[in-house]
């Protein structure tokens, strides 16, 4: 059934056409035909070579209207910071017991935040957390002494993104049930941050393609004029 729905949705999209952002969002909402609240994603093809460290694009952005997803957060810290983390809304708070759980294969959260003083011990499980995108990192704000701020930002819709080996960067920007204007605002915030992070070493056209899609829908290409550099 999913294949049939996808084919029906694909038939409504001109794959060679680039839509205005507002029209692209409207099209994705129109063709999303699933029984659950589908996630809306944006993918950007960048003119960078991620094999070179000075062309890696990674960052974070606060989506004004959040992702629509309930994000589960683990804060790894010592006792002195535990109450602060809990009060800020962390779902799980602890230290050595969670490192042990992770060593045994547990990775049942969406985001892990850690204080700098536990990173030495957390390094023991870097090989488990890294491939899953869960390893705390100072650049993304997930290694910090201000755990309350970090937890609140993640819960409010802060997302992290990083260019992949093929030069693409993608991010969830909301749910198909969001009003169109909220999706447009979230997408614009994400694209502006990607633009801001253009590496000085990148040659040629930076933004080579943008597409918006939802779970089980084809990508709808977006006009790049406003986002080309």
Swiss-Prot record:
Assigned GO CC terms: large ribosomal subunit
Single GO term (MF): structural constituent of ribosome
UniProt keyword annotation of Nuclease present: no
Pfam families: Ribosomal_L1
Keyword Ribosomal protein: yes
Domain of life: Bacteria
UniProt KW keywords: Repressor, Ribonucleoprotein, Ribosomal protein, RNA-binding, rRNA-binding, Translation regulation, tRNA-binding
SUPFAM superfamilies, alphabetized: Ribosomal protein L1
Biological processes, Gene Ontology terms: regulation of translation; translation
Family from the record: Belongs to the universal ribosomal protein uL1 family.
Role according to the record: Binds directly to 23S rRNA. The L1 stalk is quite mobile in the ribosome, and is involved in E site tRNA release.
NCBIfam families in UniProt: rplA_bact
Quaternary state and interactors: Part of the 50S ribosomal subunit.
Protein name, entry field: Large ribosomal subunit protein uL1
Organism lineage: Bacteria, Pseudomonadati, Chlorobiota, Chlorobiia, Chlorobiales
């Amino acid at each position: 059934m999913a294949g049939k729905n996808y084919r029906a949705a694909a038939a409504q999209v001109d794959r060679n056409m680039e839509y205005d952002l507002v029209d692209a969002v409207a099209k994705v909402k129109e063709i999303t035909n699933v029984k659950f609240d589908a996630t809306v994603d944006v993918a950007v093809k960048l003119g960078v070579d991620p094999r070179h460290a000075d062309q890696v694009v990674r960052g974070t952005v606060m989506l004004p209207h959040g992702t629509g997803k309930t994000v589960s957060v683990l804060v790894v810290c010592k006792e002195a910071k535990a109450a602060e983390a809990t009060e800020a809304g962390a779902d799980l708070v602890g230290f050595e017991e969670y490192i042990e759980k992770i060593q045994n294969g547990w990775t049942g959260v969406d985001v892990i935040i850690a204080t700098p003083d536990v990173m030495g011990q957390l390094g023991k499980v870097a090989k488990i957390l890294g491939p899953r995108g869960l390893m705390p990192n100072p650049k993304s704000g997930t290694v910090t002494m201000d755990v309350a701020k970090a937890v609140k930002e993640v819960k409010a819709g802060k997302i992290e993104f990083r260019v992949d080996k093929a030069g693409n960067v993608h991010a969830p920007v909301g749910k198909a049930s969001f009003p169109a204007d909220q999706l447009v605002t979230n997408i614009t915030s994400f694209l502006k941050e990607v633009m801001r992070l253009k590496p000085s070493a990148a040659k040629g056209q930076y933004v080579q393609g943008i597409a918006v899609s939802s779970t089980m829908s084809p990508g709808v290409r977006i006009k790049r004029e406003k986002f080309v550099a």
